[in-house]
Regions:
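C-terminal segment of N-terminal export signals and the immediately downstream linker at the start
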Residues: 21-38
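Hydrophobic alpha-helical
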Residues: 109-120, 220, 227-249, 321
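Extracellular/periplasmic periplasmic-binding protein-like sensory domains
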Residues: 246-322, 387-395, 400
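Segments of small-molecule ligand-sensing domains
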Residues: 302-318, 327-386, 402
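Extracytoplasmic "Venus flytrap"
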Residues: 35-55, 78-84, 107-108, 177-186, ...
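N-terminal secretory signal peptides and thylakoid transit peptides that target proteins
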Residues: 1-20
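Beta-alpha junction/loop-to-helix N-cap segments that form part of ligand/metal-binding clefts
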Residues: 33, 46-53, 66-137, 208-215, ...
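Extracytoplasmic ligand/sensor domains, especially the bilobed periplasmic-binding protein
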Residues: 100-205, 254-277
Length: 402
């Protein structure tokens, strides 16, 4: 009896280490949890919706491929209501309450800056894709996958003015208009300097508060200035509302550039023909030569149509979201782990091929050094197509207007 009891105690003792290890084993085989926010409601909901569809598609494909490190991946996304202060609170909760393993950045400059502060406090890597104030990205653990250079205030306006100069009638006078939305306002101030440095004339400069919906007075003043080209440093539907106000007074600019318009509404607008904008990806060669991109385009179109999206084509916002996940997957695979310090070091020294091109972080504040991945696209017969630089232009496409 005594021997039997001792044998049972011995077996129990042997089992204790196994029982103690069970939670750890479960943690190592359970899902990897990645947390982020998007502005699913509020003024930035359109672009955020595109990013959510793109992210959902990537997640499904990733888990079909076996996930990360042989474990399934769970994406926890919260609605930050397009408000930076809400994003800050939610990222804090994702780390401290949800106990996520990794972070992914939100949409838009303000929310990214808020998330960046939280990530720095907890030493978490933050990959993001729509941060328009590179000089404020001081945290070394943040990495931009927007495809942009550090000095976008000169690189982007130079790209746009190169495109405009290739038109049949290059502009000599430019009306410069700017929303006070931080990133586009910042780039527009750089555009004013680029315009001046090229010996061109600024016909008029006007700005408005983000959220403004009455563009009648601005439209009238632009019409009176008679510029060869209008630069619209705006986001979302601002350019649509401005062009609509111009049409109502019988005015159409000879050439228009709108920095980041809502792509679907602009392409389908009666005022959209010939409008130029920035992009890193459009649904034509050479972008579609990438088989991963081609499959993404197919699935995205189906999902966007089902969701009732105004634009069902893969564009800038959807493509950079997908590319961001490609970078995170590459980093986890490359380091064979989830340690944020190791992930950051790997990203910093590496280059990653994505659907928008080869990403690198050799510039200031972990942006691209020198020429970046941005192109100029233009609406032609209701469709966006890249027109500049020529090597990325759609077959037969050239800059219209002027």
């Amino acid at each position: 009896m005594v021997d039997h009891s001792r044998r049972q105690l011995g077996l129990a003792a042997l089992s204790l280490p196994l029982l103690a290890a069970t939670p750890h084993l479960r943690a190592q085989t359970g899902p990897i949890r990645i947390g982020s926010t998007l502005g699913l409601t509020g003024p930035l909901s359109g672009a955020s919706a595109a990013q959510k569809i793109a992210s959902d598609i990537f997640m499904e494909g990733l888990n079909k491929r076996g996930g990360l490190l042989g474990r399934p991946v769970e994406w926890i996304v919260r609605d930050d209501q397009s408000k930076p202060d809400v994003a800050r609170t939610l990222y804090e909760q994702l780390i401290t309450v949800d106990k996520v393993d990794l972070l992914m950045g939100p949409y838009a400059t303000g929310s990214i800056l808020s998330a960046m502060g939280v990530a720095q406090r907890y030493n978490k890597v933050l990959i993001h894709n729509t941060f328009g104030l590179p000089g404020l990205a001081k945290y070394d653990g943040q990495f931009s996958v927007s495809g942009s250079a550090f000095d976008i205030e000169s690189v982007w306006p130079s790209l746009v003015m190169d495109a405009a100069a290739s038109a049949a009638r290059p502009p000599k006078t430019i009306a410069v208009l700017a929303s006070k939305f931080p990133s586009v306002h910042f780039v527009t101030q750089g555009a004013r300097q680029v315009i001046k440095s090229r010996g061109l004339s600024e016909a008029i400069y006007l700005e408005w508060d983000f959220g403004n919906r009455d563009f009648g007075a601005i439209a009238a003043r632009v019409k009176d200035a008679k510029p060869d080209m209008v630069w619209v440093g705006g986001v979302g539907l601002e350019a649509n509302m401005l062009l609509d106000a111009m049409r109502k007074i019988g005015y159409t600019p000879p050439m228009t550039f709108a920095m980041f318009p809502a792509p679907g509404p602009m392409a389908k607008s009666p005022d959209g023909q010939g409008v130029m904008a920035l992009t890193v990806f459009e649904e034509h060669a050479p972008f579609t030569n990438n088989p991963v991109a081609a499959e993404f385009i197919k699935v995205y179109g189906e999902r966007a149509s089902k969701a009732g999206m105004a634009e069902t084509s893969v564009d800038l916002f959807a493509s950079v979201a997908f590319a961001s996940w490609q970078v995170l997957e590459a980093a986890v695979t490359g380091t064979k782990g989830l340690d944020d310090k190791a992930l950051g070091a790997w990203i910093k020294r590496s280059q990653v091929d994505t659907i928008i091109g080869r990403m690198r972080w050799d510039g200031m504040n972990n942006f691209i050094k020198g020429k970046d991945l941005y192109k100029v696209k233009q609406v032609n017969n209701g469709k966006w197509q890249v027109v500049w630089p020529p090597e990325f232009a759609a077959p037969g496409a050239r800059v219209l207007g002027g």
